[in-house]
Amino acid sequence: MAQHLPPVGGNGGAHTQPSLPALPAHLQSDTHLTGHLASRFHVSLPTAKLSSHAFISINTYTSSSKGQDGGKAGSAQGEAEDMADRAFLRLGHRSENQAILFLGESGSGKTTIRSHILTALLNKTSTPLSTKVSLAAYVFDTLTTTKTATTPTASKAGLFYELQYDTASTTSPLLIGGKLLDHRLERSRITDVPTGERNFHILYYILAGTSAAEKTHLGFGEPDAGTGSKRWRYLGHPTQLKVGINDAQGFQLFKTALRKLEFPRSEIAEICQVLASILHIGQLEFESSENTTVAGDESGGFSHEGGQITTVAKNKDVLAIVAAFLGVSAAELQTTLGYKTKIIHKERVTVMLDPAGARANANELARTLYSLLVAYVIENINQKICAPEEAIVNTVSIIDFPGFSQQSSTGSSLDLLLNNAAAEAMYNLTLQNFFDRKADLLETEEVSVPPTSYFDNSDAVKGLLKTGNGLLSILDDQTRRHRTDMQLLESLRKRFEGKNPAIGVSAATAKLPGSNFLSENTAASFTVRHFAGEVEYSIKGLVEENGEVISGDLLNLVNSTKSDFIARLFGQEALHTVTHPQERTTVMQASVSSKPMRAPSVMSRKIRPGTARTTRQRKESISGRQDTLDDIASEAGDSRRPVNKPSEEGASGQFLHSLDNVTKSFHAQNTNAYFVFCLKPNDRRIANQFDSKCVRTQMQTFGIAEISQRIRSADFSVFLPFGEFLGLADVDTLLVGSEREKVEAVVDEKRWPTNEIQIGSTGVFISERCWMEIAQLSDMVTGRFGVPESEGGTPLANMPYGASKERLIAAGNSPYNNDKAKSGYFGSNDIDGRSDAGVSAFGGGDMFKNLDTREQMAERGNEKSMVEVEEFKDSPSRKRWVFITWMLTFFVPEFLIQHLGKMPRKDVRMAWREKLAINFIIWFSCLAAAFILVVFPMLVCPTQYVFTGEELSAYNGKDGKASYAAIRGQVFDIGSFIPRHPLPYLPSKLFTQYAGTDITGLFPVQVSALCQGTTGSVNPAVLLDYKDTNITDSPNVFNSQDLNSRYHDFRYFTNDTRPDWFSQMMITFRGTYKKGNIGYPAQVVQKMAQQRNAIAILNGRVYDFTKYIAGGRDFRVKYNETRPTDQSLLDFMDPSVVRLFSDRSGEDVTPLWDALRLDPTLRKSMQLCLDNLFYLGDVDTRNSVRCNFAKYFILAVTIILCSIIAFKFLAALQFGTKNMPENLDKFIMCQIPAYTEDEESLRRAIDSAARMRYDDKRKLLIVVCDGMIIGQGNDRPTPRIVLDILGVSETVDPEPLSFESLGEGLKQHNMGKVYSGLYEVQGHIVPFLVVVKVGKPSEVSRPGNRGKRDSQMVIMRFLNRVHYNLAMSPLELEMYHQIRNIIGVNPTFYEYMLQIDADTVVAADSATRFVSAFLDDTRLIACCGETSIANAKSSFITMIQVYEYYISHNLSKAFESLFGSVTCLPGCFSMYRIRAAETGKPLFVSREVVDAYATIRVDTLHMKNLLHLGEDRYLTTLLLKYHNKYKTKYIYRAHAWTIAPDSWKVFLSQRRRWINSTVHNLIELIPMGQLCGFCCFSMRFIVFIDLLSTIIQPVTIAYIVYLIVRMVLTPDLVPVLAFVLLAAVYGLQAIIFILRRKWEMIAWMILYIIAMPIFSFGLPLYAFWHMDDFTWGNTRVVTGEKGKKVVVTDEGKFDPSSIPRKKWEEYQSELWDAQTSKDDTRSEASGFSYATKAPVAVSEYGFPVNPYGAYPPSRPGSTTGIPHMPHMPYSASRMSLAHSEMLMAGNRQSQFGGSQFNLPQSGSEMELSNLAGLPSDDALLAEIREILRTADLMTVTKKGVKQELERRFGVNLDSRRAYINSATEALLSGQL
């Protein structure tokens, strides 16, 4: 039985024994050991020793520094410091590397014990570096720890912290550096915070610790109302913001730590901005929106014209904050988040994301930012604290990985798997150390140790971690191969089923409940039997998660950042990028490293002894990074890289590699290991409570009983050869005997236990305790090296959070108990005094004070790097228009448009001014039309409210008529007066008898009260008779003899004299009841004058002096008064006035009245008398000439409008004959552009085109796919959908070929693939050609997408070059080859092209109808058919369009067709004549049409409306412009159905496009004098009327409303006739569909009429104002040097020579030469690919050089699904055309001389170099040697070497870049 040490602690209780192996054998079970730990725990001794290099610590959830009696002895901190002392001793005295490994579950206190050990080690060296090392650990924990359900600070990343020492010169090691190695941060937590837990602490710190000014800058804002806290998506529930953690103080400490680690203030601020942007990314909300802003790269049919469904951010303010901090444009960020580019089957495909997908994309961005930020901070810390590796002698490694978990709190299977794999590996290291370490040496030394049984987890470790065929390796391999989850599961089954008991795999298929059939098992998983329990891992999504692919869209976005910090963040080595194999500067995707950027120093020295290795951050941009020369030198032999490239490794592969490094460093020779077992006392974090079951489970998990048993047998830590042992023992030299005998004597003297010392054949195995005793170092352990604890340390030492923020905290207390301890991250007594002042100043205030504001960042992010493309001159017409625009909008200042309108760009502001000017013109036109239709007639003939006698008689109160009566020439409504009569009791019949009559006689007047005479007064006794027959001798006159007149007689002679009664009564009547005046036409006045009446017209009023002249004057006085005798008193009117009316009776005396010499007072008096006593009425001018003109003018306008509609009706009736020749032998093409349509739409369109009743051999189906895009709702990219429909296998993969595209800058260079074959559907076998625009390798987002116009141009430009025999691009040559050699038809044979949209279905006889029309009329250049709505009943929006579609075709287009000039041929269904039938002259593809339609610079409002809004209409305009001798027609019998917009927003946008494009195209057509017809019968007149009717549509509706109102109010003949005419002509429309038996159109017409205000009023007004609603791109015209206008763009300058071109004959000749010289013995044919010209003379891929660049040969069968050999069947097609040509073409070879194996021809490079006058390789190599000999390798770059070579040789060396780079690398790596 082995002897053991006596119990420590005297004769106390059982708890006094600190060593578990020292307990008796019967107490060595799990239960007894747990009991012993419990007894110690309850007396505040929560630790126990296992051996001199291992101890157990139990978390008390209180202070970690208090043991029994409040002292440090027995506490966790005490044991930690004791272990640190022993490690330090061994480090100094034995020069061994030390490794301290922590094991324990989450919440067991590992992080705290680790901080104590770290603090104790750092306290032993009093250097400023120790503070930095301590601060580095704090920063690491701040970034990687979080609060979980088990602990307030759980580590979520593996830590390998290396302290670097120089132990060569002294036994007191000198700290010279440190190295932080982080292993696999739990990234899933960043965006998915588990319930009840927190995210990483730093995110809470920044939210709580920033000042008010800083919060404002970071956009944190105010808390939500009602909750008191803002709900942050990435911070979990708001309650997690207040969980007893002092976040504000933690943030201040974090900033201080970074500052002391020499991070610049600006960089700390940038770090905070990135953290804030991550929080804001979590706040982004997304929604689906119909993007109606027009862009030049749009495609698709009618259903796309109004806009496409895109995903946008709801909260644009939050988006702007994120964009500003990232240094990018908010619009670009939103676009990037709405798309995601993936690599599917080696193809880049852009997926249009829905809101959920955009949210996931934003989460990916947040995870990427945080991961890169952590990597950046750690790498920069390492740069500050890491020593050169040649100076490192020994290291102390602190290893702490997250504890084992049964399930993932974040739902990530990958994080759970990797975390548990690390725990498994660490536990295996522990077992090997205790049970297997030194086993070989023991056997060699012939020392036997009793075997001890233990649980061996080797099966699990091998199954998980074995390189090549372990589970993590298999997962990595499957990820690299892009396999599915089920394929991974199958691979795991093959590998482990029945071979490894630790891993079990579930079935891939299962029977669903209620089904007897096997289906895919959605719950498939695999199970791993870990040392701590069995865990089931779901297979779902594991492969994709392991890839951790960062989309190329995000990288492309960041590549344009204006933030230097963001550029550095994404430029570091931690970001592994995947570049395009053919364009190395293009990053397709990337991933953040899951392993440290550095390797342990032990590993580095072992692999590369004596070589320093530093890992630096790459500072180059993503797209064009250049490795510095020292990077190349350091990486040349860096074995830390795996066999596979980092970009090819998934997370599991990288993590496995990093674990392997940890394991190797742990097992390295000269490394001594220590172990700390951390246990939880209970699962509920209750302080001072010991749960025996919980602890016993952990004891069993870690096998502590077996370890203790093993230590009882063998506790050997040191092996000392006999000589070294005797030297340490200081044995008396006089002792006689051999070394072994002397050793045995010493051992016998020491009486050490046998489990701590064994004597071998050449040396002694001894425990650490015995070694320290014999080396006389035991006393040094109890003391402390360095600064005593009583001395003051750094001021930060007394701060809360003294250790690691996971102190062994007390429940309910703050987790920041300092316990008055000088330990923790800031526990060192030395600080970097250099930065104290800066730190204190930095801690308060605003860290962003001297940095750019958020607005400045946003402005900088919107800036573009512009490149000058070309000079530009405005045309004279443009200059005139700009002048008019400024003249109309001068009053709007520029700064208002710029700031209030948010239009920083000058060209956008100019477009806005143009829009405003156009709107002014349109509004003026509308006002002018309204003036002419409404105001002008009123000015010519003002409205008169007069009544003739007959008209007055009609208002007699009968038959519902009103009751009017006349008094002294004025008409009043007595019907309204009757109820208000002063005597209400009088019967109404008494009053109604006077209705329709003149009742002047009922109201006698007092002359003196109404007239002042010539003297100023008239005698009150004067009377004047009233002529009672003055209304055209009408009998309806009541004279003064009426009995009722006496009730109104208040004249002077009556008893009741009231002279002013009549005046007052008339004032009341005029104000309330007046309806007008009596009207006398001028003819009637003349007639009355002829009847001896003294009547005349004065100022349009009729006055009668008949009674005055005839003696109707008299005196009448009261009873008993004397009658006046002076007869002159009766002449109260001036004689000249009386003579005027008597002499000029029947005339208009106005000029004579004005000529009378009257005193102004007298004239005024006479006028008063005329108006009161002699007035009869007004002159009635309603039947005058000018009033008749105004009346019939309205009628004439109505007739003109209706005549146009009538002509359209007649035109619609012209097409009644049926013309269909039987045999049509013309070749036609049918082009279908595809964008993001679904499979159903595409199949309908393709099938309908293929099923057309036309000779299948003579029609060619051409589908042009506009980009590699997966539309929303689709599961495949559109090109793949098209190819699947056509039956092209996925194995057919032709090479992408270059061609010209419509785009800005470098986007003019595009690449595409060509497929061809035969499509069979319902008995039709139709040849097809598919062109897929895939884009250049440098295109990341929406590769290849250029728009529908570009898709048309692909075919138009191809046919143009075919017919003009011009040089063609590689894609066009391939198209020519496919059509001619594969399909078997010469491209020149095709005469007609039918263009339909991908959402259009054509009738079976459409092609026949069109072609027959072309054959009937050789002057016909293009025609269209009738397009109906396929989804008519899907919504009200589509319903109101049905009739409009019908009428627009059958009236408007039919009418225009009469003139042979249909101005708009819709692109959804039109056919064009490619060439003239007689001469073969190109028509549709003529040079003029193609060049004009291919306009690239579309930067003015007019051009954008032409080419971006209505390219189909503009194409028609060009045909009419350049081929004016030809016609365009409408063929109503040709029919098609399309999808119309079914939502209001899309409909509004579509009509905005149509209306505005109509206006601008008609403006283009009006100046064209070639249009047919003349004068008002010319097409120009019709075009003008169309333009005018378009811009005044709102007035048209208002005019119709005006007619209706006027008809109701004044139902005279003319308005009724006008309205009847208008209604009748619109009724003619009904005749059309009645004749054609379209009865359903009746209902559609009613809906259309209801919606007319929308079509004619609302839509035009909306369209005109939104005329400038475009995506403007980044190409614009600016003023350059010397005032010249230049075109600039941020897309780069396009070089046309980058796309090589050849004529077909030359190309065919080279093909034939290559074919005839081919070696017939070769077994595999290689198709030629005429690829893009390379920018260098020698391809870096090893291809040969030729005048057209370096071209890789295309793949076999690269052209089509049609077989190259007749005997090879093709599953989806039949081969019936041109077999001989096909055989020749199928056996092609590259004409550039290279073989299919991509081997260059020998000597080609040298020959080209010499021909170009370039230096030879030897000359270059010699100069490179010289440059590197004198250069600073820390700063020089390969680019710099090349530039220096160019300077020395005086030539451009771009073509030699590849050689220069390779030679430079070879020189640095020692290969040359």
UniProtKB/Swiss-Prot annotation:
UniProt cross-references to InterPro entries, sorted A to Z: Chitin_synth, Cyt_B5-like_heme/steroid-bd, Cyt_B5-like_heme/steroid_sf, DEK_C, Kinesin_motor_dom_sf, Myosin_head_motor_dom-like, MYSc_Myo17, Nucleotide-diphossugar_trans
Induction line: Expression is induced in vegetative hyphae and infected rice leaves.
Example of a GO MF term: actin binding
Organism of derivation: Pyricularia oryzae (strain 70-15 / ATCC MYA-4617 / FGSC 8958)
Keywords: Actin-binding, ATP-binding, Cell membrane, Glycoprotein, Glycosyltransferase, Membrane, Motor protein, Myosin, Nucleotide-binding, Transferase, Transmembrane, Transmembrane helix, Virulence
Protein name in the entry: Chitin synthase 6
The protein's enzyme class: transferase
Subcellular location(s) of the protein: Cell membrane
Domain Myosin motor per the UniProt entry, residue ranges: 1-779
BP GO terms, sorted: chitin biosynthetic process; fungal-type cell wall organization
Pfam name, any one: Cyt-b5
Function: Polymerizes chitin, a structural polymer of the cell wall and septum, by transferring the sugar moiety of UDP-GlcNAc to the non-reducing end of the growing chitin polymer. Required for appressorium penetration and invasive growth.
